[in-house]
């Protein structure tokens, strides 16, 4: 493997169709996740340090041939206050502690 062929680090997440479509079309630039052992195992290493990803792969469902797309991974944060977000015609109100994953451009 040459320096130019460095393997990309990809965070893989599954979405429901309405959120998948809003993200794929560029309207929703934040993915919200309820805190859980599973999501923290993806975002933190065994020492509790944040993992770095190059991209996120979003799939609509769990089937092997489920629709998918990639976007840039810009980092993540934890919601400190209940906040209202509007994406297209959809409204989300987050709770304190909700994990926010920030998306860059769709690739």
Model-predicted segments: where are they?
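Structured alpha/beta reader/binder surfaces that contact nucleic acids or chromatin modification marks
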Residues: 2-107
